[in-house]
Amino acid sequence: MLSLLLSLATLSALKSCEDGNSQCGSWSDGGECTKNAAFMKDTCPLSCGICKPPPLLEQTDDPLLGPERVVLQIQWGGSSGSSGVNVPPQYGEIVLGFYREIAPVTVEHILTLVRMGGYNTNEIFRVDRGFVAQIQGVEGGRRAPMSKALREVAKQTVPDEFTKRVSHTRGMLSMGKFDKPNTGTSSFSMVLGNAAFLDNKYTIFGRVVGGDAVLSKLEQVETKKEGIFVMPKERVEIVSAVVMVSDGNGGLRLEDCEAEKRKVEL
């Protein structure tokens, strides 16, 4: 078990290296790293090559990981104050890896939804510090309209796939469900602490392999209590979710079908 899990101390020790705006890549391509060096150093250190992020976890770190990855681009906050000063939204990327070996049905279901664009414009509706950050079900959280095909897949249920090989610790992906068995659909959580009491109640189907610093930032957002849920006061939006494939050396490439879609879009 210890060989599969990074300790909280190890995760917190990793130096954060991330862009603070979704436009950083475009700004960097336009030469802003040189033209506007001070601003870009603070806002876009990753795109400007000022720092390097911690390497993504690979199979050498966790043998249960399969090759697929999902990159979530999220943003939150931002406002236009009464003084006329605009506060830009915060931005970050979280990379998910998957345990096909222990939860094959759940993993394939989630990846299918991502490939269909199901999590684009969805939200992280629950942020309970030290417990979970939960992604809303596809049918309930999206701002964009849904196709009939997506709606059909989103309401499909998956069986519980419990195992003793992993436990609910920070970074694990845990499938949401109702009280009855085998009722998971499309909502899932990223675990933010040690929650072993969830073992054998909710399916663990993967883990966060990159972007723990972004999760730590999310834990600092202002929240409100609604029933049993601790929810962010402002919407935390998933701008996009894309399936990629690990190259085994800390890098990612577009999955073949995603690459073909990008060609069509261009």
Roles of regions detected by a PLM:
Residues G20-K52:
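Secreted, short cysteine-rich peptides and small extracellular cysteine-rich domains stabilized by multiple disulfide
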Residues M1-A13:
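Cleavable N-terminal signal peptides of Sec/SRP-targeted secreted and luminal proteins
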Residues L2, S22, D42, L46, ...:
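Amphipathic alpha-helical interface elements that mediate macromolecular binding in regulatory proteins
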Residues S12-L14, S26-E32, K52-L266:
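Cyclophilin-like peptidyl-prolyl cis-trans isomerases
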